[in-house]
Amino acid sequence: MTIMPSAPQPKPGKFARAVSAQIRSSMARQRISGAQLAEMIGRSQSYISKRLRDESSFTANDCESICAALGEDLAQLVVTAAHSIT
């Protein structure tokens, strides 16, 4: 079986960066590190770090898990992120 390399992912757009900014803000308010967040949602620290640095985008499932772990409202996070780029 031949495994084809995946195509490079596009850089996160404005909205994806706004979402990660909201997540970083919530983490800072709660004094939660990237390593702690990774453990809370069952992802690797590297996976979370790349997304917090806007090198990749969080998925919708990631956002749902992160909001649940941080006690944040997912809809509010999305609305706040959207308003920050308009």
Locate predicted features.
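Short C-terminal boundary/hinge segments that cap the last helix of small helical domains
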Residues: 5-6, 60, 71-86
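Residue-level detection of the helix-turn-helix DNA-binding "recognition helix"
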Residues: 28, 42, 53, 82
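The alpha-helix within a helix-turn-helix
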Residues: 27, 38, 67
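Residues within the helices of the helix-turn-helix
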Residues: 24, 35, 64
